[in-house]
Swiss-Prot record:
Residues 44-262 form the Radical SAM core domain. It catalyses: (4R,5S)-dethiobiotin + (sulfur carrier)-SH + 2 reduced [2Fe-2S]-[ferredoxin] + 2 S-adenosyl-L-methionine = (sulfur carrier)-H + biotin + 2 5'-deoxyadenosine + 2 L-methionine + 2 oxidized [2Fe-2S]-[ferredoxin]. The keyword Cell membrane does not apply. The gene is bioB. Catalyzes the conversion of dethiobiotin (DTB) to biotin by the insertion of a sulfur atom into dethiobiotin via a radical-based mechanism. The lineage of its organism: Bacteria, Pseudomonadati, Pseudomonadota, Gammaproteobacteria, Pseudomonadales. This is Biotin synthase. The keyword Chloroplast does not apply.
């Protein structure tokens, strides 16, 4: 791909084409990805988001990677849906330390009718603060999707996790077609899609390519594409899975950037295991979004002040959100992050 073709958005990628991207020399792949990235984004800006678990544990799904599944004994305590006021307090705290998007995740197969009114109030409250809103609640029906859109939800996260061919080896309680149907409902309701997957579950190169093909060949590319590295949790079937080669993970980010030029490619779960050099390579490969705070959904996430120190060393600045002048936004982050204290409510995006 030449620089002259970086504006092309495609929805017809083939396995042969994507496999060829994966296997080309590493430097060539990163050069191509960086060229595409610079055609669509400021290469020195990264979106920062905070993720809060609003309902933790006892999920009826059997996703083999997930510590929140009720099928496995991981020691995670079940928690009820958080009160709306507590969620809004955490959102205000996230905004104060620089997050421009607040994501709320619940360990559900799908939201119940009795929980929806509370969820809708959370969306309205966070929107009123001037933040972007994102939720991951499991499978949605059309009525629920339209209600969330009416409440003002900006983004809905629903990961495809892996390729259709490998999916049945990881999850049996929800079909791939159900996941695609939820994404269709979200798209039709006018919300933006956040969807990605996980590396390190025993998948092949073709499975990694197949996941990205599914995402890139959707009618519209996801606005955000979280790429997770498996966080191995004791008690889950994948606790002894083989580690992902760091260069293979960077290749995944780079190919995602090439296939979906205008999407935010999110460096998500597993970042705690990445050293600074690997994270810097990830940004060079086209990753331009991170979750930060103390934790994602159930696993450790690098401390936010460390993130900002790394940003400073790399000359990277957070994307400014609505209502934040760049200077004010940056100052708020740097001031508050040094004083940020641990919060047990921040939890791994891979389980979304």
């Amino acid at each position: 791909m030449s620089a002259s073709t970086t504006d092309t958005l495609r929805h017809d990628w083939t396995l042969a084409e994507v496999r060829a991207l994966f296997v080309q020399p590493f430097n060539d792949l990163l050069f191509q990805a960086q060229t595409v990235h610079r055609a669509h984004f400021d290469a020195n800006r990264v979106q920062v988001s905070t993720l809060l678990s609003i309902k933790t544990g006892a999920c009826p799904e059997d996703c083999k990677y997930c510590p929140q599944s009720g099928h496995y004994n991981t020691g995670l305590e079940k928690e009820k849906l958080l009160e709306v006021q507590k969620v809004l307090e955490e959102a205000a705290r996230a905004k104060a330390i620089g997050s421009t998007r607040f994501c709320m995740g619940a360990a559900w197969k799908h939201p119940s009718a009795k929980d929806m009114p509370y969820v809708l109030e959370m969306v309205k409250g966070v929107k009123a603060m001037g933040m972007e809103t994102c939720m991951t609640l499991g499978r949605l029906d059309q009525e629920q999707t339209e209600a969330l859109a009416t409440a003002g939800l900006d983004y809905y996260n629903h990961n495809l996790d892996t390729s259709p061919e490998f999916y049945g080896s990881i999850i049996t309680t929800r079909t791939y077609s159900e996941r695609l149907q939820t994404l269709a409902y979200v798209r039709d309701a006018g919300m933006k899609i956040c969807s990605g997957g996980i590396l390190g579950m025993g998948e092949s190169l073709d499975d990694r390519a197949g996941l990205l093909i599914q995402l890139a060949n959707l009618p519209e590319h996801p606005e955000s594409v979280p790429i997770n590295m498996l966080v191995k949790v004791a008690g889950t079937p994948l606790e002894n899975a083989e580690d992902v080669d760091p260069f293979d993970f960077i290749r995944m980010l780079a190919v995602a950037r090439i296939l979906m030029p205008q999407s935010h490619v999110r460096l998500s779960a597993g970042r705690e295991a990445m050293n600074e050099q690997m994270q810097a390579l990830a940004f060079f490969a086209g990753a331009n979004s991170i979750f930060y705070g103390d934790k994602l959904l159930t696993t450790a996430n690098p401390q936010a002040d460390k993130d900002m120190l790394l940003f400073s060393r790399l000359g990277i600045k957070p994307e400014a959100g609505e209502g934040h002048a760049d200077e004010v936004h940056q100052a708020a982050i740097e001031q508050a992050l040094v004083e940020q204290q641990s919060s047990s409510m921040f939890y791994d995006a891979a389980s979304a």
